[in-house]
Amino acid sequence: DASAMKSLREFVARAKKNGITVIFSHVNEQPYAVMEKDGFVEYVGENNFRSNIVEALEYAETLA
């Protein structure tokens, strides 16, 4: 839904402004498709979407 996407985009924008990378884990196919269509995946960076929490945590460690 549009309001959810707006809220997510604002959240990520605040995080980026503060030097924080937001990493998404285990996003299901349908919500991911909505995020992709909205341009949110490109905004966040496709590499910040991980298939599971272990991958997300391992990726986060590489950013530290």
Residues covered by each model-derived region:
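Structured cytosolic domains appended to multi-pass membrane proteins
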Residues: 1-64
